[in-house]
Amino acid sequence: GSNLDWGFNKHPPVSAFFSEIFFQIFGAQDWAYYLLSQIFVVTAFIVVFKFAEELFKDKTLSLVSVLLLEGIYFYNFTTPEFNVNVCQLPFWALCVYYSWKLFDKQQVTFKDCFWLGVFAAIGFLSKYLFIYLLIAIDLLFFYVIFIKKYKKFDFKYLISLEVFIVLLVPHLIWLTNNDYITITYGLARTGLENSSFLDHIVYPLIFLGKQAGILIPFFIMSFFLIKKFKFKISLKDKKLLFLIFIN
């Protein structure tokens, strides 16, 4: 977090910003950064619990949702190290939560749009791949407004976009002044110039295999926990539609 700037060669600035805050408070104490990481993880769990509570109207199912999430490798084994992946977790959850509030309510409020824009910007400034979630959210609202017409377009939706862009401006200026070094670093890491056609088949398969292995504890927990509850799944359920798009 030393030498804070609006960007760095490898990642956007938010994870460094929070690290610097803890350094100013606690100094070079290792335990402080382990604590920082767990604060972010627990915050994500709290938001997920709140979201699940609004979705299921059941505190038990909300707790089960958090327990299942805890069973995923990236929410337990890798969390002692505070990095960009941990940094984005609460903002990912908060974006989903405020998207749900806008999706579920009949009335679009300034507050919900404003906070969605804020958390979307902070999440993106934690890690660029956060954009995948934001694209999913945009596709969801495009679908329900312009295709299915479940909801009417409201210009207040644009508040979230405006807030998002305004908060990104300093980082975009920094990128321009530094020859887009963060983006070029990410592209260089892909190894596209030295890869063969076969690599585009083999490595994705290896990646999928690793992800399947990582999710084994989650699947085991799901089997024992979810079978105790009865669910009625309807393809016309708007809650299911929301979850499909977001995931």
Feature annotation, model-predicted:
Residues F77-Q88:
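Short acidic/glycine- and proline-prone juxtamembrane loop motifs at membrane-interface regions
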Residues N3, D112-Y128, L139, F164-V166:
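Membrane-interface alpha helices of multi-pass inner-membrane proteins
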Residues K232-N247:
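Transmembrane alpha-helix segments characteristic
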Residues W6-S19, G27-A32, D179:
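Extracytoplasmic catalytic/substrate-binding loops of multi-pass membrane glycan-assembly enzymes
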